[in-house]
Amino acid sequence: MTNIRKTHPLLKIVNTSFVDLPAPSSLSSWWNFGSLLGICLGLQILTGLFLAMHYTSDTATAFNSVTHICRDVNYGWVLRYLHANGASMFFICLYLHVGRGLYYGSYTYSETWNIGIILLFAVMATAFMGYVLPWGQMSFWGATVITNLLSAIPYIGTDLVQWIWGGFSVDKATLTRFFAFHFLLPFIISALVMVHLLFLHETGSNNPTGIPSDSDMIPFHPYYTIKDILGFLLMLTALSALVLFSPDLLGDPDNYTPANPLNTPPHIKPEWYFLFAYAILRSIPNKLGGVLALVMSILILAVIPLIHTSKQQSMIFRPLSQCLFWLLVADLLTLTWIGGQPVEHPYIIIGQTASILYFLIILILMPLVSAMENYLLKW
């Protein structure tokens, strides 16, 4: 008798995706992050669902409802901090996953890569709206500043901002709709994840060498399921340590002050995972220019497959490109640091230099160095 997992219409899909899936035998731990992101998404949906049962999306009660969750609900503080720090863990895994794709040339699978970019935008939008919900000072002013950026769009900008706000300022209508979208988007993300996997399984996984591995495949289960479980344990250990020992480490103290439209915080900044993009936004003195640079800092990922000039897919045998890649990583860390600093000398010039370098490395230096490596191969 044939195994039910190979004949049942539903189980057959699971089987071909997670059990009998042929996978390259050389996959390193850098390939763990896809499954870690799946765990993060599941955790966020689960904790978010229970938080939504106690949260009220009204400007008068939102802040108090979060306090109520932490103080009065059984293990409410665990749910709240798992959700907040789970978002940080989500972005750590997300950025490492994208970095892996850049380093090993996974962007040549353009359908999977493009769906990944859409996913990145969707997760960023969800995280931004989630940050507004506790209705602290940084929630309110973050929402005001970031939504206001849309007013830089010529002609329709001001109307667009007021349409998003549901009034003439960030208020009750804004909070209610942000809660609605924050609840809805993770389910849209889940659907996009399935499309992401569908496209991935059309081509099969890339591998560290960048050389086709059709002749050397192993079943996903048990080899990579066990490997993924190790990743789960390490990530959940790190997340548990963060939640139980230092839950506010990555948060902003200003968000423990209820939102007050009459009192602007001295330094408005988003969560740490948006600081690199925020630094790029601030480094351009022109409002529209800053907004375009902000969008392009993420959208530039879509251009990368088009400017891949190397004859090799992966960077593993390309030392010059490796140097540029790690320079880009250092540049992004610098931008993240600058995004959290006040707008004053010398941070302004450092931010502007790092922003120029970011686009310079990706758009000009990487294609040039790749072409040079092709030339060196002839020797």
Swiss-Prot record:
This is Cytochrome b. Heme b b562 binds at residues 83, 182. One of its GO terms (molecular function) is metal ion binding. Component of the ubiquinol-cytochrome c reductase complex (complex III or cytochrome b-c1 complex) that is part of the mitochondrial respiratory chain. The b-c1 complex mediates electron transfer from ubiquinol to cytochrome c. Contributes to the generation of a proton gradient across the mitochondrial membrane that is then used for ATP synthesis. It comes from Mormoops blainvillei (Antillean ghost-faced bat). Keywords: Electron transport, Heme, Iron, Membrane, Metal-binding, Mitochondrion, Mitochondrion inner membrane, Respiratory chain, Transmembrane, Transmembrane helix, Transport, Ubiquinone. InterPro entries: Cyt_b/b6_C (IPR005798), Cyt_b/b6_C_sf (IPR036150), Cyt_b/b6_N (IPR005797), Cytb/b6-like_sf (IPR027387), Cytochrome_b (IPR030689), Cytochrome_b_C_euk/bac (IPR048260), Cytochrome_b_N_euk/bac (IPR048259), Di-haem_cyt_TM (IPR016174). One of its GO terms (cellular component) is respiratory chain complex III. The gene is MT-CYB.
